Curated annotation (Swiss-Prot):
Family: Belongs to the eukaryotic ribosomal protein eS1 family.
Disulfide bond among keywords: no
Protein name: Small ribosomal subunit protein eS1
Keywords from the named record: Ribonucleoprotein, Ribosomal protein
Entries under InterPro entries matching the protein: Ribosomal_eS1, Ribosomal_eS1_arc
Organism superkingdom: Archaea
Species for this entry: Methanoregula boonei (strain DSM 21154 / JCM 14090 / 6A8)
Molecular function as annotated in GO: structural constituent of ribosome
Annotated signal peptide: none
GO CC terms of this entry: ribonucleoprotein complex; ribosome
Length: 201
């Protein structure tokens, strides 16, 4: 009897839950990226959902870009998200590495004009092996270029520039004059959480 009652409670609990369809932000087309289940709407908010950029845009060439979104708003059975970061797959990164060349990683924190802090990891791939001074010059140029550009953009503009590859193209044009450069990729981004203001009352 105890087992039957326990099973009944499990069925009841499952029936009490609802499915919510999850969508990307407006600037990424409000694309459907999956479903999540919950018994209460409030427990849906804050959940992290992932999808490849290829799935979002129906472009198989972008399957190597993994996008992360946080559910920020729920209306009916629809859950709307905000972008929290992206990362390029390791297999794709390995395919970019060539012998007798350098991969130069650069970690940059930028602040957008709508006051969002974003950490970016950029990889610069050269045709030949660069020395320490050349690597330093490339990192400085990438950092200065990104920080200056980000101040003129809001978060949505920055995200669009990252996923479209436009920012990478701009950085490539900037650094190729300093050292023979094969490719520049923004391989990772993360939107930093801003702490709530502390009340002084």
């Amino acid at each position: 009897m105890a087992k039957k009652k326990q099973a009944g409670r499990r069925v009841e609990g499952w029936k009490a839950k609802s499915w919510f369809k999850v969508y990307t932000p407006d600037n990424l087309g409000k694309a459907y990226i999956g479903d999540t289940i919950a018994s209460e709407v409030e427990t849906v908010k804050g959940r992290i959902m992932q999808a490849t950029l290829g799935e979002i845009t129906n472009d198989y060439a972008k399957q190597h870009i993994k996008m992360s979104f946080k559910i920020a708003e729920v209306t009916g059975d629809a859950a709307y998200t905000e972008f929290v970061g992206h990362e390029v797959t390791r297999d794709y990164l390995r395919s970019l590495v060539k012998r007798r060349s350098s991969r130069i990683d650069c970690h940059v924190q930028v602040v957008t004009k709508d006051n969002k802090k974003v950490r970016l990891t950029i990889s610069c791939y050269t045709f030949a092996r660069a020395n320490i001074a050349q690597e330093h010059a490339l990192r400085n140029a990438i950092t200065a270029g990104l920080v200056a550009q980000a101040q003129a953009w809001d978060l949505n503009t920055l995200v669009n520039g990252v996923v479209s590859g436009e920012i990478s193209k701009d950085l490539f044009k900037l650094v190729k004059t300093l050292y023979p450069t094969r490719r520049v990729e923004i391989i990772k981004s993360k939107v930093e959480q801003v702490a709530a203001p502390v009340s002084t009352a």
